[in-house]
Amino acid sequence: GCIKTGSFCTLSKGCCTKNCGWNFHCNPPNQ
């Protein structure tokens, strides 16, 4: 699943395009 991240979340880190609540969430590239 996605993990909570700050604004440092980038596409290279596997960002989801959806905003789950207050923060964008990221999926680690290895998941």
UniProtKB/Swiss-Prot annotation:
Keywords: Disulfide bond, Hydroxylation, Ion channel impairing toxin, Knottin, Neurotoxin, Secreted, Toxin, Voltage-gated sodium channel impairing toxin. The record marks 8 as: Hydrophobic/aromatic residue important for potent activity. The modification 4-hydroxyproline is found at residues 28-29. Confined to the epidermis and to the mucus layer. GO terms for molecular function: sodium channel regulator activity; toxin activity. It comes from the Eukaryota. It is found in: Secreted. The keyword Secreted applies. Coiled coil: none annotated. Negative results: does not show effect on rat Nav1.8/SCN10A. Highly potent toxin against both insect and some mammalian sodium channels (Nav). It potently inhibits inactivation of insect sodium channels of B.germanica (BgNav1) (EC(50)=2.6 nM) and also delays the inactivation of mammalian Nav with potent activity on Nav1.1/SCN1A (hNav1.1/SCN1A; EC(50)=7.9 nM, rNav1.2/SCN2A; EC(50)=24.3 nM, rNav1.3/SCN3A; EC(50)=105.6 nM, rNav1.4/SCN4A; EC(50)=46.4 nM, hNav1.5/SCN5A; EC(50)=215.2 nM, mNav1.6/SCN8A; EC(50)=36.3 nM, hNav1.9/SCN9A; EC(50)=97.2 nM). 1 uM is enough to completely inhibits the inactivation, resulting in sustained non-inactivating currents. The presence of a 'disulfide through disulfide knot' structurally defines this protein as a knottin. Belongs to the nemertide family. This is Nemertide alpha-6. It comes from Lineus sanguineus (Ribbon worm).
